[in-house]
Every structure is written in C-alpha cells, then in structure tokens.
Amino acid sequence: MQLDTVLAQIDADLNNSVIRLLELLRIPSISTDPAFRQDCDAAADWLVLDIESLGATAEKHPTPGYPMVVGHITPPNSDCLPHILFYGHYDVQPVDPIELWNKDPFDPQVEDTMKGKVIRGRGSSDDKGQLMTF
C-alpha cells in the first residue's frame, strides 16, 4: 500500500475519528477516585467495542487495579510478520479545582482558535487523544 493511499484514507476518515474521540472523552474515567470506578470500566468496554469496530479482536482483562484492554489484528501470513505493540492509557486526571474550567471537562468540543481547530476536554492530550490514533 502506498503512503498517499494511506494518507488519503486518514483524511477521508477524519470526521468519524473525531466523533469517536469525542465519545471516549465524554467518559469520566478518573482512576485516582474510587467514585469513578464504573466509569473506568465503561471506558474499557467502550474501547473493546471501538477496537472491534475497526476489524480487530479485543478483550478486557481484569487487573488488581483497572481493566487492561488488549486488541489483536491477525492478517494473513501473520506468523512471518513482526509484532507491534501500541500502548496507552484510557484513564484521566481529576478535574479539581473545577472552578478553573471554563466548560464541563467531560463535554469535549472542537473549537476554532487563532492556530486552527483544537479539541478541548479532559483527556484530549493525556492520553485519550494519543490512544485514539489507532
């Protein structure tokens, strides 16, 4: 597959990718607060479904802390191909003090700025935004 083909597909899928990211950002998966335990589980469940929607298999594995999500893509003749590990985390930091937020941190928005469009919301740059690059 040529690089131009891959880049064209990324451009074609951009709006859908942003919608997927905004969905994940709406889940308040704050792992440092036990009150958000169910939200962390919900984020893991969401990721399993999202990975599966991309044509991969995915499973949620329990750990002593929060669940780990593992996805696999198994192309034909994969036994002779190298393995690639894509690692990231789906939890976010607390929003305290909430008074410093201009908007609800879990109601992400695409905003126009002087430097172009940005996505604002808790986790958009640590680490849900990076996680969704797959």
Go through the PLM ranges and name each one.
Residues Q2-L131:
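Acidic/His- and Gly-rich active-site-bordering loop/insert found
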Residues F134:
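Carbohydrate-associated surface elements
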